[in-house]
Amino acid sequence: MLVRNLTGVGLWMLFSLLSSNAVFAQEAAPTPASPPTLQERVEALEKKSDAPSIWKTLGFKASGFLDVAYTHNFNNPSTNLNQLHIFDTNASSFMPHLAQVMLERPADASGSAAERAGFRARLNFGSDARVTRARTNYQPGVASDEMDFQELYAEYILPVGNGLKVQFGKMNTLIGYEVINSFENPNFSRTFMFGLGQAFTTTGLRLSYTFNPMITATVGVVNGWDNVDDNNKGKTFEWLVALTPHERFGASFYGSVGPEQSNTVGGVVAGGVGANASATRTVVGSILTFKATSQDTIILEPYYANEANANLVAGKGGKNARWNGLGAYLIHDIDDQWSARVRGEIFEDAGGARTCTGSVAGTVGGFTGVPGGWNTCAAQPSGNGGLVGGGGIAQTLWDTTFTLQYKPLPSLITRAEFRYDKSNKSVFLNGNDRSNNQETLSFQVIYLF
């Protein structure tokens, strides 16, 4: 009853904010000046010295951010973990999610041969880095390192037509709308579709070309999903086509195809389920963006994936596994400081290949734990009345999320978020008991520099 009341209050607050947009717009105070960024501080020192530094001469740029949050779980799970969440994994706890430092030199297509060369090094520290570390075939690891190079690549723009950009190294994936950095997403938490069904990063070679302001195409050959070290002899092909036919509408079409399984996975013998180096994973999806008004943006993301030899459902082991979903976002910018965001998602893991592969909890088998606590579930009943888990659970998941964002300064972002998760299986924990739903309330602070 408490959760329902809180949900009702949250919805009433969101409706009130949306309906009072005109009042906010008229009465909002001017945005205070933001503290200087790291790049601006460097430029100020250069002015004092009356001489350009090597930093400026080489075109280097530095930036970063700090991300901390508190998440409360109304189910009060006995494991102190939010089931099936990716980064916001600790229940009723503060988390130092990420401290990121990025050094880059963007390549300049209109510059000299030397200016056409560039690089990016993006280094992560914090609890999120335990998850963003490169993973092979999405199997849980045992290390607890809280440092990870999210991106580390060199680039060069060849003088071909409008400029052919060549990138080589570790880069954020082309797949999906959401990304690792929370402040670049509409909401604090991530979708099941991104966290459990898509790649985070890829390592390899990528080519990008802008034909005109309306069409950009990117293709790449990479080691595979989240693989710095390739886990097989095959390579994965990735692509993205971004179209902007109108200033109020954009459509991107992405995908990848290639072998993602290694010869061995844990105790699974070569050629067994999830360990066939020739099994192909195919992914396609799109991102549709509508700028309905100057203040309202709608994003839709349909997504489909299929992989051979990955099904973990009893009696179907070794067959194809399918996972697919649909994400929908509404972003309403009330003014320069306030913004309300609503997200809805459905994610189906028909083969049990993507969900609950982290660890399980229950009265039988206990709780094994995984660094970061991601992709955990309550144990499921066995045929003899006990509880079993691990190996994934075929299910359909829903996520409804309401986020209110306030930026008192351009460099300071604060968020309050209520999220409701539901499954057609009892994979969540309510205390020590299994449940088919989970509610969380989060507060986040991000400082950009």
Please place each PLM-identified region on the residue numbering.
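Outer-membrane beta-barrel pore domains and translocons
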Residues: 67-71, 122-126, 169-173, 220-225, ...
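N-terminal periplasmic/intermembrane-space "pro-region" immediately following the signal or transit peptide
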Residues: 2-86, 372-387, 449
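Residues on the lipid-exposed face of transmembrane beta-strands in outer-membrane beta-barrel proteins
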Residues: 64, 96-105, 151-156, 168, ...
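Short loop/turn motifs that connect adjacent beta-strands in outer-membrane beta-barrel proteins
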Residues: 51-62, 107-117, 159-164, 214, ...
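Surface-exposed coil loops of outer-membrane beta-barrel proteins
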Residues: 77-91, 128-246, 252-273, 361-382
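Glycine- and aromatic-enriched membrane insertion/assembly motifs of diderm outer-membrane
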Residues: 82-127, 331-333
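Outer-membrane beta-barrel pore domains
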Residues: 85-88, 129-132, 138-142, 249-449
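Transmembrane beta-strands of outer-membrane beta-barrel proteins
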Residues: 60-68, 115-121, 164-166, 217-219, ...
